[in-house]
Amino acid sequence: MAERADLVFHNKAIDGTAMKRLISRLIDHFGMAYTSHILDQIKTLGFQQATATSISLGIDDLLTIPSKGWLVQDAEQQSLILEKHHHYGNVHAVEKLRQSIEIWYATSEYLRQEMNPNFRMTDPSNPVHIMSFSGARGNASQVHQLVGMRGLMSDPQGQMIDLPIQSNLREGLSLTEYIISCYGARKGVVDTAVRTSDAGYLTRRLVEVVQHIVVRRTDCGTLRGSSVSPRNGTITERIFIQTLIGRVLADDIYIGSRCIAIRNQDIGIGLVNRFITFRAQPISIRTPFTCKSTSWICRLCYGRSPTHGDLVELGEAVGIIAGQSIGEPGTQLTLRTFHTGGVFTGGTAEHVRAPSNGKIKFKEDLVHPTRTRHGHPAFLCYIDLYVTIEGQDIRHNVTIPPKSFLLVQNDQYVESEQVIAEIRAGTSTLNFKERVRKHIYSDSEGEMHWSTAVYHAPEYTYGNVHLLPKTSHLWILSGGPYRSSIVSFSLHKDQDQMNVHSLSAEQKSISNLLVTNNQVRHKFLSSEPSGKKGERILDYSGPNRIICNGHCNFIYPAILHENSYLLAKRRRNRFIIPFQYNQEQEKELITRSGISIEIPINGIFRRNSILAYFDDPRYRRNSSGITKYGTIEAHSIVKKEDLIEYRKRPKYQTKIDRFFFIPEEVHILPGSSSVMVRNNSIIGVNTRITFKTRSRVGGLVRVEKKKKKIELKIFSGDIHFPGETDKISWHSGILIPPGTGKKNSKESKNFKNWIYVQRITPTKKKYFVLVRPVVTYEIADGINLATLFPQDPLQERDNVQLRVVNYILYGNGKPIRGISHTNIQLVRTCLVLNWDQEKNGSSMEEVHASFVEVRVNNLIRDFIRMDLVKSPISYTRKRNAPAGSELILANGSDYTNLNPFYSKARIQQSLTQHQGTIRTLLNRNKECQSLIFLSSSNCFRIGPFKGLKYNNMTKKSNKRDSLLLIRNSLGPLGIVPKIANFSSFYYLITHNQILINKYLLLDNLKQTFQKLKYYLMDENGRIYNPDPCSNMILNPFNWNWYFLHHDYCEETSTIISLGQFFCENVCISKYGPHLKSGQVIIVHVDSLVIRSAKPYLATPGATVHGHYGEILYKGDTLVTFIYEKSRSGDITQGLPKVEQVLEVRSIDSISMNLEKRVEGWNERITRILGIPWGFLIGAELTIAQSRVSLVNKIQKVYRSQGVQIHNRHIEIIVRQITSKVLVSEDGMSNVFSPGELIGLLRAERTGRALEEAICYRAVLLGITRASLNTQSFISEASFQETARVLAKAALRGRIDWLKGLKENVVLGGMIPVGTGFKGLVHRSSQHSNISLEIQNTNLFEGGMRDILFHHRELFYSCIPKNFHDTSEQKFTGFIDS
């Protein structure tokens, strides 16, 4: 009775953990048998009560949490703001995903915490509440899904779906939510199946590695130990106790001079408590790592057996127990795949909140600006940062630990409880970080730009993978490549350095021409050496460089002759855009044709002048002949408007549908040559005409002599001698349409095609008719060039239109002579500029065109820019004037004076600007060539900006635009084509003519004025400004304008440069509209034209795919982010972690890649200590280090799951995978071959015996490799790759000593554990006899073996029962592999 009185009376609800504690205390107090009796009674009691209560669960018992509505609403609001930031390019996709997941996770967690108090207050006897919180059925997570919200689900890959399920199961799910939750549920079911098999396989491999480890000895005599220190802050007290209990001390422990524990004493709970209270020095304990042998273990190094609390028995198969202890929780835990919370939290960081309102102050030198995980700006502090918050009457000091983010700025006013800093979740948190790649794909097609320098990743110097050094935007500029059914082209400017990326219209990718196995060569033929050698200068000054670039034909890879090279001769302002034909059906080589865009040197087009032309290869002949237009001559009467002007020669456009070409073969021979055929004779094909030439066609020969030359024509065709009745017109020839037969002729046959009938009179009386075949050409629309140049993006009035015009290059009936082997173009398709003439067109209008170069980061883009302008000054063109001088004013020499012949009104009227813009983009990139077309959807116009006031002295406020007027008529300043000494003119409006010079005083400024400036510009980009009182500085390299603001400007103007990028919602001027995101391509006086672009944010370390300026299609990979994410905590993710650690896969998640660390330790230590010691100590230290970190990693996984596994089990396994070294190179000793895996101890012994260094380094084997590198080939063969293992063993003549369990099981022998263990000791005496016989037969080898194991015997001489081991080791010294 006395005992019972000591027990305390407990009056409280007992849950699972309390039950565990109760049972363990009962066992301590009463022992096993009595405890089980008590527990039986408890069980009976429980069942009785449950039967009486009979809890049932109905749908009404599921009470939803009232605060859910506003919590969800709040989270949605945050997500919306986030979405906006992502759209503006402030955060990138990974940050957005991470933050939105964290928002929802926090919401879900908050609801979950609300759940319990809510039940407790509203309905404490609720069945759901009773069941789940007593631990009977259902856990918090499941109840949370019933009454809170289901929250985030993961997809089959284990990635989070960032669309949370907001409803709970009580309210019911929407359709989308249902589908997403099916994802998660299906994953749960599949995982359970898959993971069970995974866990089983893991167990099998673990057992395989350690099956031969048995306790064979009481003490191995080791002097080493692992030190464990309670002071070290990294281990908690609980883990410290777990580590120590059941171990054996390796050293005496003193407190002061008093010894409280001696070596080889096993540690019980009492001793541990004393250690904790005394906080003694680090405690050195024996672990399986310190044991001397690799193939067995001794009792003291193993410690207590966890089953009965005493030292482990001899003959215990501890290896198998260890393997099963680690593998088994895996199989158990796979059943827990219900997705419980711990998903994707980035270790939700702790926050530091402000204690009171006030101003915050800290030292700014100690912090660095950075981005948080969510892309918010913050400051990072590297050391402890002291922050003071000054309120009205109180100062608070807050210390912020290192590596934290400060979320406020210096001197900022903070409110109480505002978050001022975020402490990084320390490394001690038990969630696993792993590196994940996330690809971001482009949403639209377009051209890629980036705004900072980008490094090539070192492995891919020539590839298209780049690394970003700092945070920057990637821009996808809209506008796609021109896709045509038959053509693809590339554009080369003079002297461009090109790469082999060419855009092919058929393939969607940038096709490498090397695909068709033709090596594409680039030849640069230049008429003069360009600059110094080695400088890659793009030189545009030479007027006639020839560049020939080798686009081989896709059809015949082997042919590389002249036609397959495109010779693009570039005059000063002419581009040729070559088309590329890829016609599979006609197996012939079609030479390239190209669109030529030509701009006159002064950049002025009149109406109806030709902007570009294209030679259609369908209207191309390589033989001579005659063109005829239709039979009716009236068609060739041309109306006045159809006059188009080309290179100052008018051409007539003939409105005909078809024309005819009559081929003939023409040879023009020198007068002296002897002709071998007669006039009017008929010859066949390939007849010799002169010594060198032969005829290509057969037919009638006509020979004429002209001016010292003989012209010889061969007409092919049929000859008819007409009867009396046939009247043939006396014309030179007529065309007869198909279907008309010869009248009254005997053979009235119909002609299928058009024919040309020509009358030939060889003599006066006789004549006959030659019927010649005719090639008919229908003039189709040709290639629709208008699609190349989309109409004006901004749909303005007064626009320049483009007409497509076909005209025939040769007149009616004119003979065409082809020089030998050249092609004759019959029809040319032209683009003609046209615009609506004003009715009262007093002055002539003209178009000013220029190639605009927009330069961003050394990538030059060419636009063609056209502006329709009334010519301000009527001009006369002098015949011999140089090209640039066409626009000189009547008295152009005096440039301070405006032209006096025009009144004020007249000038203002003539300078109203008609903006006609046809814009196309010529890409002049080094790497990929294409035309990019901007259509109206890709551009938008901003402007005009109103509201900048100039205050004059007369206090008149005159509204002007915030962009000062620049050059109203000739397009934007600074984009003059870079032509040598091209003088460009900038007109600025003057309201009253006032003479201005630099001595003017301010009181004269009664009117607003701007003045006319001349700039002279040479091709280097320098600007010579003859006018000293200019108020504009031009920086020629960036083409920026800096406006010097005068005193009368109230606000400064924004600097807008050509090629600048804007993000959305950036304000340019105070009153101006908000921008969309894009790149400025045209700056007008009062407005901008912006090419729309989408920004993608990329942070350092991201990989950019693709080249700068490359065309990307929708869905192409743009960037790859590598980011750390925390795996969700359930064991489904945990098990693969254990497996990765045990297999030592070099996955980034193994902290900083253990293998690399191992190599690092190996090298450094060897370097410090020199060769022989270096290898030994290097390997030892390396192995010790890696062992500790591996054990900690594996424990971390299991602890996070709440599974307790004793360290020694893990240590036994880790010992097996870290105890081998790799022989690195062959020294003098030929004992081991390089690349051989040997045990560390064996390497040391051999090194000592041979007194010579063996070079080796520590390696980490995975468990699979370790299983295949054991002492026993039978065990290896029964594991994996049976045939290979057995074959190798046979070739090497390996001997299996049957020491392990598995080999004996396979062969049916007695296994050497437990009672069978003693048998092994008796058997060993026979081994020693065999050993002696062998020594006699091979004295040298035996002697060497003696040396080898001599030191071993010294060690063991003091230990009883050492006879068995040493003899056996002697025998197996060299043979075991």
UniProtKB/Swiss-Prot annotation:
The keyword Zinc applies. Its cofactor is Zn(2+). In plastids the minimal PEP RNA polymerase catalytic core is composed of four subunits: alpha, beta, beta', and beta''. When a (nuclear-encoded) sigma factor is associated with the core the holoenzyme is formed, which can initiate transcription. Keywords: Chloroplast, DNA-directed RNA polymerase, Metal-binding, Nucleotidyltransferase, Plastid, Transcription, Transferase, Zinc. This is DNA-directed RNA polymerase subunit beta''. It catalyses: RNA(n) + a ribonucleoside 5'-triphosphate = RNA(n+1) + diphosphate. It comes from the Eukaryota. One of its GO terms (biological process) is DNA-templated transcription. Its main location: plastid. It comes from Nandina domestica (Heavenly bamboo). PANTHER family: DNA-DIRECTED RNA POLYMERASE SUBUNIT BETA. It is found in: Plastid, Chloroplast. It is an enzyme of class 2 (transferase). Zn(2+) binds at C220, C291, C298, C301. DNA-dependent RNA polymerase catalyzes the transcription of DNA into RNA using the four ribonucleoside triphosphates as substrates. GO terms for cellular component: chloroplast; DNA-directed RNA polymerase complex; mitochondrion. The keyword Chloroplast applies. One of its GO terms (molecular function) is DNA binding.
